[in-house]
A protein has these predicted regions:
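Structural recognition of the beta-strand scaffold that forms the well-ordered cores
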Residues: 61-63, 82-84, 134-137, 159-161, ...
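A short, structured surface patch at a secondary-structure boundary
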Residues: 63, 68-128, 133-140, 147
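Solvent-exposed loop/turn segments at secondary-structure junctions
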Residues: 66-69, 87-90, 133-134, 139-143, ...
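N-terminal export signals
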Residues: 6-27
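Pocket-lining segment of extracytoplasmic ligand-binding domains
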Residues: 252-266, 272-297
């Protein structure tokens, strides 16, 4: 994640929510706000908008981050959900969709109010469902400003949360908003503390390392198109690019003008990456040789697909190929309060001795089992070519 600010430097939005970010005397700096479960609730969302919720919401539309919503709220929070962005959820996050709908079959009966993987919102459908609260992401908010005004005039409280920017303060604020909104402060706080303390420890260990071991050249690519085409890479402001920036890896796409775009084969080869990372998921598209990772994906299948990328034409002389510094990661697991485990994993990839005690994949699965025991979290989330 990009931000390295401590809790004492968090935005006023955190204080306005009235939750304790850290120990070490932070409690004394917080305003005297109502306890959880008391209303009205007044706070500032990630778009710095003051939001007032006058009574406990009973009807909620979740237009983004349903996995985070359930991690914080637990299975009981699903009873409040009257609308979801269901369009293309199954085709763009197939593994996640299968796991969550198997555990909670009722999800499939919840009306769809737009696209899971785009910013399209169906205003008429939202109004017809009469929600008390609409939870949306930042890009949805930006793309639907006029619709948001219409919805708020109709009495719907719109709350903007964000896990895309990979900023610690947004992850924490969004999770605490969910915890307070759903009466699950303890669960939200536990997830936040794991994230905050985990990233702080990662930063501490990396800062103690000599500069000579940092900034190894790295190429990260989303493998949804298969080895025959080059998928997106990310600059330092978003997703994997932000993670690589944080751990001081030398991403060859770090300074790209666009947040995400595909690099050419010639450029990748010319930069001779020492480490290659392929992002996978389970996309329901026609690219049968796509990189598959995440929920429900068997390890041998993921490894075979990763080897397909390693065997690309003209890649045989890349340093990463020669030294087997070739890895797979689950793209679908990003944009979540638990995605700091991928920062930990990549820190271990780049600095194995400094993180030899870390077991991020096992810890990620354990977190799912602890906070959402109804789902089956088995799958392949982090992978090295050396396992083959």
């Amino acid at each position: 994640m990009i931000s390295r600010r401590t809790v004492l430097q968090f935005s006023g939005a955190l204080s306005a929510l009235g939750l304790i970010p850290f120990a070490h005397g932070a409690e004394a700096q917080l305003p005297d706000l109502p306890l959880a479960g008391t209303w009205p609730l007044v706070f500032t969302d990630v778009e710095s908008r003051k939001v007032t919720i006058r009574e406990e919401p009973k009807r909620i539309i979740v237009a983004n981050y349903i996995a985070n919503y359930l991690l914080v709220g637990g299975s009981g929070a699903l009873q409040k959900v009257v609308g979801l962005t269901q369009d293309h959820w199954e085709s763009t996050r197939t593994g996640e969709y299968r796991v969550f709908t198997k555990a909670f079959p009722g999800i499939t009966q919840i009306p769809s109010i737009g696209g899971y993987h785009d910013d399209i919102l169906n205003t008429e459908r939202i109004l017809s469902l009469k929600p008390d609260v609409l939870l949306i992401g930042r890009t949805q908010f930006a793309a639907n400003s006029q619709r948001v005004n219409l919805l708020e005039r109709a009495g719907i409280r719109v709350i903007v949360i964000d896990y895309h920017a990979m900023k610690l303060e947004n992850h924490v604020l969004s999770t605490r908003i969910l915890g307070r909104l759903l009466g699950r402060d303890d669960a939200g706080e536990a997830l936040c503390r794991e994230c905050i303390e985990g990233l702080s420890e990662i930063d501490r260990r990396i800062s103690a390392l000599p500069s000579s071991v940092k900034h190894r050249t790295c190429y990260m690519e989303l493998g949804n198109l298969g080895p025959g085409q080059y998928g997106n890479s990310y600059n330092a402001t978003i997703l994997w690019g932000a993670i690589l920036k944080r751990i001081e890896a030398g991403s060859i796409s770090e300074k790209n003008a666009e947040p995400y775009s595909a690099l050419t084969r010639e450029f990748v080869i010319s930069r001779a990456p020492e480490v290659v990372i392929i992002g996978g998921s389970l996309w329901g598209n026609d690219h049968a040789d796509q990189m598959r990772m995440g929920f429900t994906v068997e390890r041998p299948d993921a490894l075979k697909r990763l080897q397909g990328f390693r065997n690309r034409p003209l890649w045989q002389n890349l340093p990463a190929v020669k030294t087997n510094e070739f890895y797979g990661v689950d793209h679908g697991s990003l944009r979540s309060i638990v995605d700091w485990r991928f920062t930990q994993y990549l820190a271990k990839v780049f600095y194995p001795e400094a993180f030899k005690d870390a077991e991020p994949e096992a810890a990620l699965v354990a977190t799912y089992r602890r906070h959402l025991p109804e789902i089956d979290p088995r799958g392949t989330f982090m992978l090295s070519i050396r396992e083959g």
